C-alpha cells in the first residue's frame, strides 16, 4: 500500500482558497435499497416435523382408484386436466429431483414427505420422483402414496429425458408467495 503524500502548508492554503464559496452537492440520483433482514435457516427439528407431517398421509392399506391403463397418471378433482397434459408434454421442468432407488418402503415414504415439505417451503411447483424399475414395489406404491396427499395436484409418467416410465413428474400445490415487506 502506498503512503499518502502530505501536502505542504502552502498547497493546503491554496486548496482552501480555491474551494471557498463552494458547497456540497446533494446526491439525488441513486436510491439505496433498505437493508433486508437475513433469512434464518429452518431449524432441524422443524424440518423433521414437516417431513413427519407430510409422510403421515401415506397409507399402505388405502388404495386410491387410479387408471391402470396406459401411463401412470393422476389429477386431483379440483385441478384442470390441461395441467396433466402439460406434465405429459414436458411443459413443466422439475426443479427438485428425488431418487428412491435402493430405499425401503418406509424410507421412501419419509423421503416423499420431505420432498413435498421442501417444495412447499421453497415454492417449487414441479418435482421429479425417480422410483426405478427394480422389483416394482416402489413403482407400484409411489403413485398410490402420492394420490393420497392433499398437496399433490397431479402427477404423470415422466418424459424420457426425466426418467421415462421409471419416474413421475409431480405438481405440488404451493402457498401463494408474498414478497417480504419493506420497513
Swiss-Prot record:
Matches recorded under SMART domains: SMR
One Pfam family this sequence matches: Smr
Gene: smrB
Keyword Kinase applies: no
Family per similarity comment: Belongs to the SmrB family.
EC number: 3.1.-.-
Gene Ontology MF annotations: RNA endonuclease activity; rRNA binding
Domain Smr, chain residue ranges per copy: 98-173
Top-level division of the source organism's lineage: Bacteria
Reported function: Acts as a ribosome collision sensor. Detects stalled/collided disomes (pairs of ribosomes where the leading ribosome is stalled and a second ribosome has collided with it) and endonucleolytically cleaves mRNA at the 5' boundary of the stalled ribosome. Stalled/collided disomes form a new interface (primarily via the 30S subunits) that binds SmrB. Cleaved mRNA becomes available for tmRNA ligation, leading to ribosomal subunit dissociation and rescue of stalled ribosomes.
Protein name per the record: Ribosome rescue factor SmrB
PROSITE patterns listed in its UniProt record: SMR
Record NCBIfam families: PRK04946.1
UniProt keyword terms in alphabetical order: Endonuclease, Hydrolase, Nuclease, RNA-binding, rRNA-binding
